[in-house]
UniProtKB/Swiss-Prot annotation:
Pfam families: PHP. GO terms for molecular function: phosphatase activity; zinc ion binding. This is Probable phosphatase YcdX. It comes from Shigella flexneri. Zn(2+) 2 binds at H15, H40, H194. Keywords: Hydrolase, Metal-binding, Zinc. The keyword Cell division does not apply.
Length: 245
């Protein structure tokens, strides 16, 4: 069990079923010290309004010893790497994940998908690329991993991709993990929970990492401090309330 989970959705994304309070309760039971709520960006049909993300600034930082990061799973919109997060949203958020979602950016050919993903990585606006192993979006894995390492952007291994969605992701995710290993980049593990009961579950992710001998020191979820150091290296101001996590 790793004490950090970086990808989960609440009832604000209406195809998910848990509240912030539900996640806090599960985190306490499971020994999760720090987690990020990352509801879908507003260009998705059932996503929250952009005011939802701006108003996350009112959330407490720590509840019952559990740290809460304010995040978003934004949508990659085009080959220029634009995402549906901007302006005051950035000011309120700690963690920006971005990925391909069919209602916003339909699958294209390998070159176009790769260009869109690398442009997003190079934009400086994103910390993590979500589920890059999605088989519906063929990419140049080596080029993406090298760009991610260069720009200090983590590539996600998404536990839900092996259980509930994006069927057939295993081979691609092994390739992603191996390419990140070779490029000296970062991997982020995400449960992609749409119900609090699955938060912190990374069993399938770890099978992927074990298969390619991925180094423990390049996994962001190993400790709250490792993740916070990564975010601070990308410009996030230190959060005093997290000092004792």
């Amino acid at each position: 069990m790793y004490p950090v989970d970086l990808h989960m959705h609440t009832v604000a994304s209406t195809h998910a079923y848990s509240t912030l309070s539900d996640y806090i309760a599960q985190a306490k039971q499971k020994g999760i010290k720090l987690f990020a709520i990352t509801d879908h960006g507003p260009d998705m049909e059932d996503a929250p309004h952009h005011w939802h993300f701006i108003n996350m600034r009112i959330w407490p930082r720590v509840v019952d010893g559990v740290g809460i990061l304010r995040g978003i799973e934004a949508n990659i919109k085009n080959v220029d790497g634009e995402i549906d997060c901007s302006g005051k949203m950035f000011d309120s958020l700690d963690l920006i994940i971005a990925g391909f979602h069919e209602p916003v950016f339909a699958p294209h050919d390998k070159a176009t998908n790769t260009q869109a993903m690398i442009s997003t990585i190079a934009s400086g606006n994103v910390h993590i690329i979500s589920h890059p192993g999605n088989p519906k979006y063929e990419i140049d894995v080596k080029a993406v991993a090298e760009a991610a390492a260069k720009h200090q952007v983590a590539l996600e291994i998404n536990n839900s991709s092996f259980l509930h969605s994006r069927k057939g992701s295993e081979d691609n995710c092994r390739a992603v993990a191996a390419a990140v290993r070779d490029a000296g980049g970062w991997v982020a593990l995400g449960s992609d929970s749409h119900t609090a009961f699955t938060m912190g579950e990374f069993e399938e992710c770890l099978k992927i990492l074990d298969a390619v001998d991925f180094p423990l020191e390049r996994i962001l979820n190993v400790s709250p401090r490792r993740l916070l150091n990564f975010l601070e290296s990308r410009g996030m101001a230190p959060i005093a309330e997290f000092a004792d996590l």
